[in-house]
Each structure stands twice: as structure tokens, then as C-alpha cells.
């Protein structure tokens, strides 16, 4: 039996990984499996109350029986972003009662708004100010069984890599390939999880530079691109709202706002770090991708550059390969490599340059290679272009 498992360990691993992922998804959906229900309409419990010289919507519902609310759903039209509060009488895993408060937002971009509550309650009260030109048309709650594709993809990737680390010992002889696979999988997950909004430090500035560089003479500014550049967005915190955001940005990506003429066709050396991102943005337009997909595609250019450079840094390193692997897979470095930024070029080029320097200084066989020294200087130079403060160092 054991020998058979060893012989077919990869097939067994696939089956086990699929089962574990399915079990986790079932556990996360356990409240829906045990007591699931479709939309419970709370609109009939909605009233408009006066508070001073203002009006507010109040939706108050209580039940003699405990019930599970996975998601709250509000529908309506609003002139801008407003907060609403949720008061619940809820029960924890030990059946201890408590009164809790939560808040979320509605906005002018969408007509449907969602809040993940995931609580067992006996009462819920939603309060939302009623400004001029605002209308709340419907409120409901639900506890539906739903497969979360993002969670499924994450655990499939995590378990697969865990299997490789524990049972595929050959991979330790090729640490650069372990890095490449890990960075590619989790980098892509980061890119497609974070949605078409600003996420990393100063990402709106870096996107602006990459977007401009992706055009030759005239820059076609769409409403969606300007939303990213100007950090004009709305608050989203659920899958359903992010789906609405993608649809909104895709439509805004078709709206031409104005054309900006480039002063210089030849790019400055300070923007060389954005070339991979600009190339992939350009390819996204050539292939007529939606704005959301094009925005993610531009980040893939940055990720592939990071993987390529650090792959060779780990591969050619004479010592401390495991340390380099740990360094390159640190969450911040991988997150930046999956974003719009110049830091990826700075970090990866400097790292590869340092590896070449260490190899030449401490592990040379006969004499120092002039070609490698020139290449090392070139790496340091290009890496310093975006952050000139490093040049004196």
C-alpha cells in the first residue's frame, strides 16, 4: 500500500489537495449548509424618521429565533458616498449574547451595495441618513451557499506548494525554480485579487508614469485611467461590490476624456523602470482588453521582470541561495512586484548586481571578468535611475 502511494504520489497529492480545498470551502459555507436561505426581504420594515432637521432611513427587524446573516444587500441611488450603521443583537460560538455595531457605505457609482456580516443574530437595525436626491429602494439579507473562487484558488496554490516543499526534494537543488513558481503563482493571485484601484504606496503616480510611457505621441486619457491617476474611487469590501467596480471601470475605460500631447517622444532615463509595465499596458490596448484586465496586465509586466532578474540572481549566487530565496519572497517585495512601482527594478537590479560583485570578489577562479564588471555597473546604474539618491553610494 505504502509503495503504491509512493509510486503514484503526485496523483495522490492532486486528489488530497482537491479534497482539502473542498473541505475548507464546505467549512466556510457551513452556516449556509445548515440553515441557508435566499433573500429575506427587509424592505417592508423600512421607515423614514426625522432627527432634528434631517431625515433618516431605519430598517429594524427582529426574530424570536436565532438566524444567520451572511450578507446584507441594499439597493438605491445616492449622489455621493454615505456611511450607514448596522446594529445587531448577535451570539458567538458559545451562545453569548452581545450588541454590536458595524458600518459600511453606499455611493453614486453603484445601485447595489453589500455588507458581509457572517453573524448569528436575533435582531438587526440599519440606519442611513436620507439626504436630498437619495433614495433607498430595497433591503434584504441572505445566507446562501456560495463557492468563493478566490479562496479556492489560494488554497489550491498553497497546498500545491506545500506538497512541493515537503515531498519534492529535487526542488531544493533548483531554488531558482522554486522561487519562479512561487512568485508567479502568488504574484498573479495578488494582481487579480486587488482589483482596479490604488493599493500600494504612491501607485497612482507610478500608474500615471507607466500609462504615459505606453503611448508614443498622444496620450489618450479615459475616465477610468483618470480615476486611478486621481485616486477617484469608492469603498468596496465584498466580492459583489468589486464585481460592480470592475464593470464600472470597464465602461469608464471606453469613455474618452481628452488627449494629452507628449512633449518628448524619447522617454527620460528616470522612467526606464516603467518600461515593462508600459509594454504590457500597450499590449492590453492592442488586444482590446477591458480596462480592469488591462490594468492587471500592466502589473504582470512588472512581476515578470522581477521573476526574471531574481531567478538569475538566485541561480548564479555562489553562497546564501536560501537567504536570497527568503529575501525575494518576502511579502512586501512580492506585493511591490505585483503593483505599479519602480521599486521592483531598484531592488532586483541592485540584488543581481550585488550577487555578481560577491561572485567576482570572493569566488573568482583566475581573473576578474571585465564583461561581468561592466554588466554589474550597468545594473547598478539602471537601478539608480529611478532613485538618484543611490548614485553616490
State the predicted function of each range.
Residues 215-297:
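Interfacial juxtamembrane loops and adjacent helix segments
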Residues 161-165, 296-319:
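Transmembrane-helix motifs of polytopic, lipid-linked glycan transferases
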Residues 289-292, 311-332:
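Transmembrane-helix signature of polytopic, membrane-embedded enzymes
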Residues 30-36, 69-70, 74, 88-90, ...:
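Exposed low-complexity, polar/acidic, P/S/T/G-rich flexible segments that act as propeptides
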Residues 339-346:
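Short acidic/glycine- and proline-prone juxtamembrane loop motifs at membrane-interface regions
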Residues 372-388, 393:
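Membrane-interface alpha helices of multi-pass inner-membrane proteins
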Residues 317, 353-372:
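Membrane-interface transmembrane helices that cradle and orient dolichyl/undecaprenyl
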Residues 1-33, 145-190:
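Start-transfer (signal-anchor) and selected internal transmembrane alpha helices
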Amino acid at each position: 500500500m505504502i509503495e503504491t502511494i509512493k509510486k503514484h504520489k503526485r496523483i495522490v497529492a492532486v486528489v488530497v489537495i482537491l479534497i482539502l480545498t473542498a473541505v475548507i470551502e464546505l467549512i466556510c459555507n457551513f452556516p449556509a449548509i445548515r440553515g441557508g436561505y435566499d433573500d429575506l426581504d427587509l424592505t417592508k420594515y423600512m421607515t423614514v424618521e426625522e432627527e432634528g432637521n434631517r431625515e433618516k432611513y431605519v430598517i429594524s427587524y427582529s426574530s424570536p429565533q436565532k438566524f444567520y446573516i451572511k450578507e446584507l444587500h441594499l439597493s438605491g441611488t445616492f449622489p455621493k458616498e454615505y456611511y450607514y450603521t448596522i446594529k445587531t443583537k448577535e451570539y458567538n460560538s458559545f451562545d453569548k449574547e452581545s450588541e454590536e455595531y458595524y458600518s459600511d457605505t453606499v455611493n453614486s457609482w453603484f445601485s447595489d451595495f453589500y455588507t458581509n456580516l457572517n453573524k448569528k443574530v436575533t435582531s438587526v437595525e440599519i440606519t442611513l441618513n436620507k439626504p436630498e436626491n437619495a433614495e433607498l429602494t430595497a433591503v434584504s439579507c441572505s445566507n446562501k451557499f456560495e463557492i468563493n473562487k478566490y479562496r479556492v484558488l489560494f488554497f489550491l496554490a498553497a497546498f500545491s506548494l506545500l506538497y512541493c516543499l515537503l515531498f519534492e526534494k529535487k526542488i531544493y537543488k533548483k531554488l531558482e525554480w522554486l522561487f519562479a513558481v512561487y512568485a508567479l503563482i502568488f504574484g498573479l493571485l495578488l494582481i487579480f485579487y486587488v482589483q482596479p484601484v490604488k493599493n500600494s504606496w504612491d501607485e497612482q503616480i507610478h500608474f500615471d508614469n507607466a500609462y504615459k510611457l505606453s503611448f508614443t505621441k498622444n496620450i489618450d486619457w479615459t475616465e477610468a485611467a483618470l480615476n486611478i491617476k486621481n485616486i477617484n474611487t469608492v469603498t468596496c469590501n465584498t466580492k459583489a461590490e468589486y464585481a460592480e467596480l470592475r464593470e464600472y471601470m470597464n465602461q469608464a475605460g471606453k469613455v474618452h476624456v481628452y488627449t494629452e500631447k507628449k512633449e518628448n517622444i524619447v522617454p527620460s532615463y528616470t522612467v526606464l523602470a516603467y518600461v515593462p509595465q508600459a509594454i504590457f499596458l500597450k499590449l492590453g490596448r492592442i488586444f482590446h482588453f477591458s480596462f480592469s484586465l488591462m490594468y492587471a496586465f500592466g502589473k504582470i509586466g512588472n512581476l515578470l521582470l522581477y521573476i526574471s532578474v531574481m531567478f538569475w540572481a538566485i541561480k548564479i549566487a555562489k553562497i546564501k541561495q536560501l537567504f536570497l530565496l527568503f529575501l525575494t519572497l518576502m511579502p512586501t517585495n512580492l506585493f511591490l512586484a505585483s503593483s505599479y512601482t519602480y521599486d521592483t527594478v531598484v531592488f532586483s537590479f541592485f540584488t543581481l548586481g550585488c550577487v555578481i560583485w560577491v561572485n567576482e570578489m570572493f569566488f573568482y577562479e583566475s581573473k576578474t571578468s571585465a564583461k561581468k564588471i561592466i554588466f554589474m555597473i550597468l545594473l547598478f546604474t539602471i537601478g539608480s535611475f529611478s532613485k538618484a539618491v543611490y548614485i553616490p553610494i
